[in-house]
Each structure stands twice: as structure tokens, then as C-alpha cells.
Amino acid sequence: MTPMKRSVQTQVSEPFTESWGEESLPELPTEQSLTEYSDLKEAPSAHTLYVGHLNPQFSVPVLACLLRDTLERLEMPVAREHIEVVRRPRKAYALVQVTVRRDTLASLPWRLQTALEEHLILKELAARGKELLLSEAQGPLSHREEEEEDSGLSPGPNPGSGVPLPAWPTHTLPDRPQAWQLQSCQGRPSGVCSDSAIVHHEIVGKDQLFQGAFLGSETRNMEFKRGSGEYLSLAFKHHVRRYVCAFLNSEGGSLLVGVEDSGLVRGIRCSHRDEDRARLLVDSILQGFKPQVFPDAYTLTFVPVISTSETNVPLKVIRLTVHTPKAQSQPQLYQTDQGEVFLRRDGSIQGPLSASAIQEWCRQRWLVELGKLEERVKVLTMEKEQLQQQLQQHGPMSCTCCVL
């Protein structure tokens, strides 16, 4: 390169250098700002999670409880009112409203697989021969229904069109109004919503008890159990069979666990997981009763107990209420899933009844029904005689002319 050309190049490059020097270069974002930007970009957002291949043999409340426990083990806690379960005769699925990061949602399938391998998830939650299907719900979800149909399940309506789904809010969970959360729980059966649910640091439910309060004495329709130690895992299932069967064969009643025989409220340690297990246990036992016991025949609630002592596990009173059986056209006697029959007496349970005792019970019930029918026939007979007398009094007078 010649000296002249080199000087020209120097003269041309200097103005650029001066101009860049005069204007300050834009500052690069600092590490703190990048961190804030990434946090803002990865902020939790609301998503609708589709859960397929659920076991249709369980009822909707039990599926909701088991699914909530499963999501907790996957480090994705969800309130029960944010779980919408759709159950068909041979298929079931759920739509869950979650507020998580995108990366958490993307890692959900492999975390589910890891939990299944470590036996942290109840296998019975999935349909027989199937595995749980977790994915983000987008659009009408028709392709997921086709996957279930291809996998052997019976076809059903499209969940996006045939079932009216709730309009999930698009903003995050902390900004949701409390009225919406209460409304989503009020529209469901009473067995689904727990009295111990907490929304905005307030107990949702009209019932709460104070430790040491006096509830009264046991009656024919009220039974108290202290429930200490390993009661929930050992004795609770036997008491469910005995007392529910006895209440069904009488005028109904309530079993309260966490109350002493004297009527003082103590409460039992009952976590959300224990609550779910209790619901599953009661549901599985009552499904084996004969005649069939429908969900509207009983109510299982968990009443929070307010205590002055600080405990990590909340105290609750388990209340299993059997409603007064509807009048039947003929006497009906319930038996447990083990074929045993119990009756409620004043302050005690009679049973299991022998064959002769059951026959005597049926004979007495039929005598009562026969007496009612005889009384009804007597009333109808009297009404018939009165109507005949009225017809004779108001009837036309006939005259007969005799010619001699």
C-alpha cells in the first residue's frame, strides 16, 4: 500500500472514530438486570392441565382427591376446587387449573415417570392396563380423546364440546377473586368440598369446633369415637361398616371421630393425605353394600378444630353422616360388603345379625306394613259407604201407580 493511500485511509477512519467517541455507547445490561428479566420472563402463569386414562371405577370425589395427592407428590400443589373431573362409564379424565412456570410444566412427564418407578403414585389411579396421560390442554382436546379411543377405551363425547367446562381465569392464582373460588366449590356435591379448605387465610365452611367444647351426649343417632393412636389405619374401616349399616337400617345418624364419649371435642391429627385416604376408604366400603348406597345417602366432612397448642398437623373431627333413608315400597335391610347386617339400638350396635334375627326383623316389618294397609282399607271402605249413602239421599223419587 502506498503512503498516499494509507493517509487517505487514516483520514477516512478518523471521523468515524471521533463520532463514536462523541456519542456514548449504549450500556450493556448488567447481570442483575438479566436476572430480573429472566425472572420476569419465567414468571408462573395459569395453565390448564389435561389428565387422561383415569380409573372410571372410582367416583368423581375420590378421583379428585387422588389426583390432588398425586400432583402434590409431583411438587405441583393444587386446590380441590381447581380440579374438574369428567367421568364416563368406561373412561374418565380431568382438567386441572395450575399456576406454574413453563419449564416446570415441560418437566412434568419425566417427573411422573420417575414417581411411578419409585412407587410414589397409586397405581389404581390409572385405568387398568393404562398409564396416566399428562399434558397441557389446548383447543378442543379432540386428539387426546382419539388417543384414549385408540388405546381401547370406549368412545365418549368430546370434552371440549359435550361437557360444559368452567371458564378458567387467565391471570395468576393470587389475583383471583375469592368469590370465584367459592362459587366453583358450591356447584359441586357436598362430599367434594372440604370444610378445612383455606382461601385467603380464611376457613371456607360454616363449621368449626373448639378443642374442649362440649357437644352433648351420645344418642341413638349420634356416636362419638376418640380416634387416638392408629385409629384411622386400624379401626376406622370396621366402624364405618358397623355404624353406616346400622344407621341405614334405622333413622340415620352421625359418627364423629375425634370426640370423647363424654362429648368433649379433642380432634385427631388428620393431614390432607389422611383426609384423601379416608374418603377413598369410605367410598370403597360403601360401594360393596347391598342394596347399593348412592352418594347422596351420606356425607363425609372434616371439621377443623381450633386449638391453643401449636401443631404441625392440623386437628380435625371426622363426621360421617348417614341421611334418613327414603321411604320404600317394601321393607329393606342393608348389608355390608362382608355380608353382615347391623341394627342401631339405644347406645349400642346389634349385630352381625343371625339368619333367625333377620327373619324376625322382616316379619315385624311386614306386620307393620300389613297394619298400615289394613288401616288404609278400613278408611277407604268407610269413604265408599258414605258416598253410597249420599247417592241414595239425593237420588230421584219414583212413584208407582197401582190400578185396581
Curated annotation (Swiss-Prot):
Chain residues that bind ATP: 258-265
Coiled-coil portions: 365-395
Polar residues: compositionally biased ranges: 7-16
Family annotation (InterPro entries): Schlafen (IPR029684), Schlafen_AlbA_2_dom (IPR007421), Schlafen_AlbA_2_dom_sf (IPR038461)
Protein keywords: ATP-binding, Coiled coil, Nucleotide-binding
Record's keyword annotation contains Nucleotide-binding: yes
Highest taxon, organism lineage: Eukaryota
Compositionally biased region (Low complexity): 152-165
Chain intervals for the UniProt region annotation (Disordered): 1-31, 139-170
MF annotations from Gene Ontology: ATP binding
PANTHER family associated with the record: SCHLAFEN, SCHLAFEN-LIKE PROTEIN 1
Stated family: Belongs to the Schlafen family. Subgroup I subfamily.
Protein's recorded name: Schlafen-like protein 1
Organism: Macaca fascicularis (Crab-eating macaque)
